[in-house]
Swiss-Prot record:
Family to which the UniProt record says this protein belongs: Belongs to the recoverin family.
Primary gene name: Kcnip3
Chief place where the protein resides: cytoplasm
Protein name: Calsenilin
Tissue expression pattern: Detected in brain cortex, thalamus, dentate gyrus and cerebellum (at protein level). Expressed in brain. Colocalizes with KCND2 in excitatory neurons including cortical and hippocampal CA1 pyramidal cells.
Function per UniProt: Calcium-dependent transcriptional repressor that binds to the DRE element of genes including PDYN and FOS. Affinity for DNA is reduced upon binding to calcium and enhanced by binding to magnesium. Seems to be involved in nociception.
Annotated organism of origin: Rattus norvegicus (Rat)
A GO cellular component entry from the record: voltage-gated potassium channel complex
Listed Gene3D superfamilies: EF-hand (1.10.238.10)
Keywords: Apoptosis, Calcium, Cell membrane, Cytoplasm, Endoplasmic reticulum, Golgi apparatus, Ion channel, Ion transport, Isopeptide bond, Lipoprotein, Membrane, Metal-binding, Nucleus, Palmitate, Phosphoprotein, Potassium, Potassium channel, Potassium transport, Repeat, Repressor, Transcription, Transcription regulation, Transport, Ubl conjugation, Voltage-gated channel
One Pfam entry name: EF-hand_7
Length: 256
């Protein structure tokens, strides 16, 4: 039961909480707030847990440390270059690559594999759609595969990035068609995918209209000029003035 309750918390860059947990009749007059991330919820982030679980040293040689394994079909960028691109230390990059290589010997993660990973962490629901959206957010060049470089750059932003960088990453996740705007349709698709991932056995039971209500609250807060879309400027300005979001972003720092 405790795990089910904890699974309700947002993760993987999601800034949205769950309005479905409080009956509508009791929410009147209550100021809407996004829940803060907990360290426990963050450490259950599928990507982090998946990689770190395989990152323990297993007698690897120096070639592992230098990210130059001839058996890997996709060779990642050099260690120095990745260290310059991210906010990870050399030792952290070596550990992350060891875990990535153990799980993905080819050096690539395709979308089907990514969905399988998420399905294992959310067996009570359907994580397929949310995994699709998250995969596209990590697949920076849109080539249908997540390279180690894609993984560590995204992870660096989520764990060590500035608030501005994290918010831009979150906006990119919500902007499904990457046209620079978040529409109600896009946000509803994201919210439905999150609720589907939670499953039907959560407690308290989620109401059917919770995703739509969440979207309406999101746009009331974010759509400053009420033109039906949320721009990156509106998103950044509103979020950076929200103490709840600012506090939640700090929990991404120094986790690894």
């Amino acid at each position: 039961m405790q795990r089910t309750k904890e699974a309700m918390k947002a993760s993987d860059g999601s800034l949205l909480g769950d309005p479905g947990r409080i009956p509508l009749s009791k929410r009147e007059g209550i100021k809407w707030q996004r829940p803060r991330f907990t360290r426990q919820a963050l450490m259950r982030c599928c990507l982090i847990k998946w990689i770190l679980s395989s990152a323990a040293p297993q007698g690897s040689d120096s070639s592992d440390s230098e990210l130059e394994l001839s058996t890997v079909r996709h060779q990642p960028e050099g260690l120095d270059q990745l260290q310059a691109q991210t906010k990870f230390t050399k030792k952290e990059l070596q550990s992350l690559y060891r875990g990535f290589k153990n799980e993905c010997p080819t050096g690539l993660v395709d979308e089907d594999t990514f969905k399988l990973i998420y399905s294992q962490f959310f067996p009570q629901g359907d994580a397929t759609t949310y995994a699709h959206f998250l995969f596209n957010a990590f697949d920076a060049d849109g080539n249908g595969a997540i390279h180690f470089e894609d993984f560590v750059v995204g992870l660096s932003i989520l764990l060590r990035g500035t608030v501005h960088e994290k918010l831009k990453w979150a906006f990119n996740l919500y902007d499904i068609n990457k046209d620079g705007y978040i529409t109600k349709e896009e946000m509803l698709a994201i919210m439905k995918s999150i609720y589907d991932m939670m499953g039907r056995h959560t407690y308290p039971i989620l109401r059917e209209d919770a995703p739509l209500e969440h979207v309406e609250r999101f746009f009331q807060k974010m759509d400053r000029n009420q033109d039906g879309v949320v721009t990156i400027d509106e998103f950044l300005e509103t979020c950076q003035k929200d103490e709840n979001i600012m506090s939640s972003m700090q929990l991404f720092e120094n986790v690894i």
